[in-house]
Structure formats: structure tokens, C-alpha cells
Amino acid sequence: MRIVALVGDLMDQSRISASVPSVTFVSDVEGTTDADIIVIDLARHGRAVAEVRRLAPDAVIVAFGSHVDEERFRAAEAGGADRVLPRSRFFRDPAAALAHGDGP
């Protein structure tokens, strides 16, 4: 299973890779094409969700962002994200968020 993350923040990358060592970080949507699971940071790549869905129609897309940014959450869902989580819930346990959608 190939897990790809469109996450640019180094601290976020560190937290994700500590929980999901097999993750591959990419800097653009083209890097997501052959992934099974794709993580998207909505703060930096929120507008990319629809393009990622187009390039990887069968992948599970898990997006995270600020809990107060309801508009971005709705846009991510409309763009094809399977799961959209507040940052706090996603980072509580990234591996569980990818497996179950919402962590413990």
C-alpha cells in the first residue's frame, strides 16, 4: 500500500512520519497519481483536492485543516476528499486517522 502526503510543513511531516513510517511526501499533485492513500494539508494545498481526485480516482483522500475553516472543509468534501478532519483529531494519531478516518 502506497501512502503519499501532500504536506509541506516540516513539523507536520515529522509528526506524520513518526506514526506512518512508510509515508512518501510529495510537493505537487503529480506525485499522488499511484497512491492508495493520500493525505492533504488543507492549509497549504486545499485547492488541490479536486485535481488529486482526478489524478487518483481510486485513492482514499484524507484531508486535515483548521477546525474553524468550515468553508475549506466543505470545499475539500466537494472536491472529492473521503475524510476531512480537524488538525487536532488527525494529529492525535495519524495512523489511526488513515485507517479509521478519525483517530482514537
Task: Describe each region flagged by the PLM.
Residues 10-26:
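Two-component/phosphorelay signaling modules centered on CheY-like receiver
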Residues 25-34:
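Short acidic low-complexity segments
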Residues 39-52:
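Conserved phosphotransfer microenvironments
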Residues 81-92:
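Output/docking surface of receiver
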Residues 49-83:
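Mid-chain, well-packed structural core segment of small domains
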Residues 42, 65-66, 88-89:
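Short secondary-structure boundary segments
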Residues 2-9:
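Conserved acidic segment of CheY-like receiver
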Residues 96-104:
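Receiver (REC) domain switch/output surface
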